Structures are given as C-alpha cells and as structure tokens.
Amino acid sequence: SDCQVSNIQVMQNFDRSRYTGRWYAVAKKDPVGLFLLDNVVAQFSVDESGKVTATAHGRVIILNNWEMCANMFGTFEDTPDPAKFKMRYWGAASYLQTGNDDHWVIDTDYDNYAIHYSCREVDLDGTCLDGYSFIFSRHPTGLRPEDQKIVTDKKKEICFLGKYRRVGHTGFCESS
C-alpha cells in the first residue's frame, strides 16, 4: 500500500444491519490528544429509517489524574460509500471530547472481528498525519486465532502496523 488515504480500501457491500450490536475494542491506534484508554465497548444501532447511531464507553483520565468511565454518543451520516460514514460524537459530560470524524469500516466478518479507521488530518503528501483506529471483536476475550492474520494484513494496508496498543477489559465501566 502507498499509504494514500484516498486509496485505502474499505469493506465491500457493507451491511449496516449485520454490523449492529456490541463490539469490544481489543486494540487501538491513538490519535493526538485525549482518548479512551481501555475498557472500550461500542454498541451500534440502526433505526427504522436506516440511520446509524452508536454509544460507547471507556476509561479516561481527565484533569491529569481523575479516572472515570466516559459515556460517548455518536450519529452517523451516510456518504456515497456504504462503508464510509461521517461521525458526529459527543460525551455525556461537557468536559469530554466532541467532534466530527470519518468512520470507515475497513473489514469485518460481522460475527467476530471488525477493523475501523479514521483519519482526522491528511498530510500534504496524501498520507494520514493524525488518525486513529480500533480493532473490534464480538468477544471480550479478543480475536480468534484465525482472525489475527486478516487483521494484521489490514493494519499493514492502512499503514498503522506496529502502532496499536492492546485494550484491556477489567470491568471498570461496569461498576461505575
């Protein structure tokens, strides 16, 4: 891959209704700035009109040392490509981040794994200057061995290989 954002391949024939439900983030590539640390779980829904919405939670540290569970909300605007959305997101509390990011589904089998990608800022050379990505699993225990290779190949294709950190699930957000 030449790492041009405009050349990144996304999921073909993406089926939003099969994508709904709960996904556990098992790895993430961070953007610049405040971000969810771990215990990240996302829930996607599609309403009667076909609109996609999502909620997510995860552990954050704000004000340098205050640890809390952040609840986030997002609405998805369709684009001509069914696997590419514009996501407007905000937090349940005013001090959490708000924004408008691309939300691309790079690949998924709907039942086990999904690879998400978002480039916030494209560099002058067409590569991604600031972006983030989640590797999602339907299982809190992580990816199945047979999905690992596919995911590694896709990380390479989106030029984020070696930039991911594991996302732990300790139940932090369940208790709060």
Swiss-Prot record:
Disulphide-bridged cysteine pairs: C3-C159, C69-C173, C119-C128
Annotated compartments: Secreted
GO cellular component: extracellular space; yolk
Residues that coordinate or bind substrate: Q97
GO MF entry, a single one: retinol binding
InterPro entries: Calycin, Lipocalin_ApoD, Lipocalin_CS, Lipocln_cytosolic_FA-bd_dom, Retinol-bd/Purpurin
Keywords from the UniProt entry: Acetylation, Disulfide bond, Retinol-binding, Secreted, Transport
UniProt superkingdom: Eukaryota
Acetylation found in the keyword field: yes
Classification via Gene3D superfamilies: 2.40.128.20
Ion transport recorded as keyword: no
N-acetylserine found at: S1
Pfam families, per the entry: Lipocalin (PF00061)
Similarity-based family: Belongs to the calycin superfamily. Lipocalin family.
Job description of the protein: RBP delivers retinol from the liver stores to the peripheral tissues. In plasma, the RBP-retinol complex interacts with transthyretin, this prevents its loss by filtration through the kidney glomeruli.
Record protein name field: Retinol-binding protein 4-A
Organism: Oncorhynchus mykiss
Species classification: Eukaryota, Metazoa, Chordata, Craniata, Vertebrata
Gene: rbp4a
